[in-house]
Amino acid sequence: MADIVSAGWAFLMVSFTFSLSLVVWGRSGL
């Protein structure tokens, strides 16, 4: 169960960072 929770948090952080970087790149015009 702990491994599933850890994997879920890892996936959440990766997806959040990826979406945030896309927003930053979009606003900077790259």
Curated annotation (Swiss-Prot):
TM spans (from-to): 4-24
Claim: Ligase is one of the keywords in the record: no
InterPro entries documented for this protein: Cytochr_b6-f_cplx_su8_sf, Cytochrome_b6-f_cplx_su8
Location, primary (coarse class): plastid
GO molecular function: electron transporter, transferring electrons within cytochrome b6/f complex of photosystem II activity
Record keywords, A-Z: Chloroplast, Electron transport, Membrane, Photosynthesis, Plastid, Thylakoid, Transmembrane, Transmembrane helix, Transport
Entry GO CC: chloroplast thylakoid membrane; cytochrome b6f complex
Disulfide cysteine pairs (residue numbers): none
Location in the cell: Plastid, Chloroplast thylakoid membrane
Membrane topology field: Single-pass membrane protein
GO process annotations (BP): cytochrome complex assembly; photosynthesis
Any matching Pfam family: PetN
Summary of subunit composition and partner proteins: The 4 large subunits of the cytochrome b6-f complex are cytochrome b6, subunit IV (17 kDa polypeptide, PetD), cytochrome f and the Rieske protein, while the 4 small subunits are PetG, PetL, PetM and PetN. The complex functions as a dimer.
Function: Component of the cytochrome b6-f complex, which mediates electron transfer between photosystem II (PSII) and photosystem I (PSI), cyclic electron flow around PSI, and state transitions.
Similarity remark: Belongs to the PetN family.
Stated name of the protein: Cytochrome b6-f complex subunit 8
